[in-house]
Amino acid sequence: NNFGASKVISWPGGTLGGSGNPGVAALVQQNQYSIGYVELTYALQNNIPYGKVQSPVGEFVEPTLETLATAAAASSLSLPQGDQSWASVGTYFNLHKVADPRGGYPITSFSHIIVYKELNVIPGMTKEKATALVKFLWYAVHEGQFYASGLSYVPLPKEVVTHNEATIRMITFNGQQVATWS
């Protein structure tokens, strides 16, 4: 927490920052004895070596689909509602906030999308476009999970799917719920 939570953190002097997975990987490879963080998918696809990270309970955990899934499931119990502030969630799951973080990779996060709760505030938005967006979100949370493992991502835990369903049902257009089929 010394540096806060942000997509871009102001690190102390003497540190290097790369742009995205390719930039970070290149800097680490060019600078002996350096470490960096890239997505597991990127590391696997590019044969980049990676190591274990110490968890809040002192356990050293290797990043695998199983340890990422364990972290996601444990963290899902402390997620705020979809229409509440997510500022406290941070960039990575905070396994310090969960009862049993054992077996969870400690620097894991969800990929996410931010959507207005009331879609008619978006210029040019129509009921048809709102419905298409909400149907896409529903697909991503359900049928789209089929593709996760093949891309070295973890399918959403059941608790997160349920959480996302409730959030998607909150989306409205002109005050009317869009996801009327769910």
Task: Annotate each PLM feature.
Residues N1-S182:
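Flexible loop/hinge segments at secondary-structure junctions
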